Amino acid sequence: MKSYDVMTLFAQQLERSIASSDECKTKVVITPSSVNEKGVVIKVSLLKTFRDKEYQAKSKARSVRLRVSVCGTVESQTGLKMATVLIEKLDDFFEQDSLRLEEIVEGANSMQTIRKIPNTRILQRISQEDSFFYNPDSTDVQDVQDDRTVIITVPEES
């Protein structure tokens, strides 16, 4: 599986798992993108892709390091609520046991099913020092940024 495919599948998986609700509209954007969403979005950015020799000694694996950010402009308490709800939904997503990359597979009668891709894993790292608001003491419109690093390891194509 190629790194771009991993990133795309992960973004789709996030969008499915963190479904929009009345209190929070969810938009997942892969950067770079010409999409200029108003409000708070989840951005997925490629940081690095590399052959991972430590994952499984018997087979070749590739690790894709991504930045997943809840970011945007908060103009009111409603925007602040939306940002915190998205962060909490991401926390819930990453707390799943044995988190694996998923893909949608066409089945009989054009039925789509979600399949966990074997021998994949998804890990996250969070820095407790990350800033949420750039200037928390200001009463002006605020830019928010909550970053986490995600590492997805997949079997490498032969």
Predicted regions and their residues:
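Short intrinsically disordered coil segments
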Residues: K58-S59, V85, Q142-T153
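Residue-level signal for secondary-structure boundary sites
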Residues: F50-D52, S76-T78, P136-S138
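Small/polar-rich, solvent-exposed N-terminal microdomains that initiate assembly or binding
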Residues: M1-K58, V154-S158
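Acidic-leaning, charged glycine-interspersed low-complexity segments
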Residues: K89-Q145, E157
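Extracellular/virion structural assembly segments
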Residues: Y55-S63, C71-D97, E102-A108
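Ser/Thr- (and often Asn-) enriched beta-sheet segments in non-cytosolic proteins
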Residues: K27-V29, V41-S45, R65-S69, R100, ...
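Oligomerization/assembly interface segments of phage tail-like spikes and tubes
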Residues: K60-Q77, R121-Y134, D146-R148
